[in-house]
Design a protein with these regions (language model features):
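Immediate flanking context of iron-sulfur cluster ligation sites
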Residues: 67-80
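Small-residue (primarily alanine) positions within well-ordered alpha-helices
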Residues: 10, 14-17, 27, 53, ...
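Zinc-dependent deaminase
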Residues: 1-19, 81-141
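Glycine/small-residue-rich phosphate/adenosyl-binding loop
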Residues: 37, 54-63
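A short, polar/charged loop-to-alpha-helix boundary motif
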Residues: 45-55
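Short beta-strand scaffold segments in enzyme catalytic cores
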Residues: 25-33
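Short beta->alpha transition motifs characteristic of CBS
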Residues: 36-43, 119
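A cytosolic small-molecule/anion-sensing beta-strand core signal
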Residues: 31-32, 59, 71
Length: 141
């Protein structure tokens, strides 16, 4: 299993958000090639502006491991994380971030936004991630 496989898993989570009429962003967290946390946007469902895919996936991984730091873990997210989610990733000490599509408008990614040891890899399946987002917003308009 590789980055492409796990980003496809994150896209599957994003589809769940799309189906629930949420902004279609999904995330999975892995350790040792095993998914330990997953999430998709649930902002509208939970009436909670912090219920982003990354936050839900992080909480799931923390609960699974019984730990608050994830230096050996990788998060796969369909869209570049926002500033809030980058902050959560920073405090989790996540080992690696892999994202699908950049988000120039709302993305909060910068080298200082994440833990200095966090590896970053972007633009994996970017077109698939963008297509899902565009489909969602076309449906809304």
């Amino acid at each position: 299993m590789d980055d492409a496989y796990f980003l496809k898993q994150a896209l599957s989570e994003a589809q769940k958000a799309f189906d629930a009429d949420e902004v279609p962003i999904g995330a999975v967290i892995i350790m040792e090639n095993r998914i330990i946390g997953r999430g998709h946007n649930q902002v509208e469902t939970l009436t909670d502006p912090t219920a982003h895919a990354e936050i839900i996936a992080l909480t799931s991984a923390f609960n699974f491991l019984g730990a608050k730091y994830l230096p050996e873990a990788t998060i796969y997210v369909t869209v570049e994380p926002c500033a809030m989610c980058c902050g959560a990733l920073y405090w989790s000490k996540i080992g690696k971030l892999v994202y699908g599509a950049a988000d120039p408008k709302h993305g909060g990614l910068s080298r200082v936004a994440l833990h200095p040891k966090t590896e970053i890899l972007g633009n994996i399946y970017a077109n698939d991630c963008i297509d899902l987002m565009q489909s969602f917003f076309r449906k809304k308009r």
